[in-house]
Amino acid sequence: MSFNDTQEQFAPNMALVPMVIEQTSRGERSYDIYSRLLKERIIFLTGQVEDHMANLIVAQMLFLEAENPEKDINLYINSPGGVITAGMSIYDTMQYIKADVSTICMGQACSMGAFLLSAGAKGKRICLPNSRVMIHQPLGGYQGQATDIQIHAQEILKVKSRMNELMAQHTGKSIEEIERDTERDRFLSANEALEYGLVDKVYTQRS
């Protein structure tokens, strides 16, 4: 997780998106694949976590809650992490809305991706068997006058403390354990993430 809020390195994914064509009573209707999956209450969190992507994720969750606040939302995660403030906007929305958010890790959930994976509804946090999870403390860098550097250092320590508290709540670990285990990059397999309390289940196929 990066504490810096510079976004230049995080460009929206411009890859071609497949289209899906459906037959309706009024003829054919085409959707991009992500819009079609959104109809099934599936949201994809892929790539770097940054403001543009986070705003889209938040908007989709709010839309699905407005459509049906009693039905689960499925958040598929394949992310190396990213900017803390962007990730926290997703986190707060997950906790704020009435609908349960089930989190599913496919590929990787590292840094902020792992934090969001752990923040899913209890009993509904899932890892696919060959996924990788990585947790660590926030990263930051700042240049400027000594006083400004001190201010930013104090702020990143506050953020680190708060994130350790939240991770402890979601995993059942103590704050001391979280602080120790995130001192350096810690990589976990799907089963290790299950044992650690980051997820509740490891699925090899749909039940």
From Swiss-Prot:
SUPFAM superfamilies reported for this sequence: ClpP/crotonase (SSF52096)
Designated name of the protein: ATP-dependent Clp protease proteolytic subunit
GO MF terms held by the record: ATP-dependent peptidase activity; ATPase binding; serine-type endopeptidase activity
EC nos: 3.4.21.92
Catalytic activity line of the entry: Hydrolysis of proteins to small peptides in the presence of ATP and magnesium. alpha-casein is the usual test substrate. In the absence of ATP, only oligopeptides shorter than five residues are hydrolyzed (such as succinyl-Leu-Tyr-|-NHMec, and Leu-Tyr-Leu-|-Tyr-Trp, in which cleavage of the -Tyr-|-Leu- and -Tyr-|-Trp bonds also occurs)
Function: Cleaves peptides in various proteins in a process that requires ATP hydrolysis. Has a chymotrypsin-like activity. Plays a major role in the degradation of misfolded proteins.
Taxonomic source organism: Proteus mirabilis (strain HI4320)
Stated family: Belongs to the peptidase S14 family.
Example of a GO biological process term: protein quality control for misfolded or incompletely synthesized proteins
Active site: S111 (nucleophile), H136
Enzyme class, spelled out: hydrolase
Major subcellular location class: cytoplasm
Localization (cell): Cytoplasm
InterPro entries according to UniProt: ClpP, ClpP/crotonase-like_dom_sf, ClpP/TepA, ClpP_His_AS, ClpP_Ser_AS
The keyword Protease appears for this protein: yes
Record note on quaternary structure: Fourteen ClpP subunits assemble into 2 heptameric rings which stack back to back to give a disk-like structure with a central cavity, resembling the structure of eukaryotic proteasomes.
Domain of life per record: Bacteria
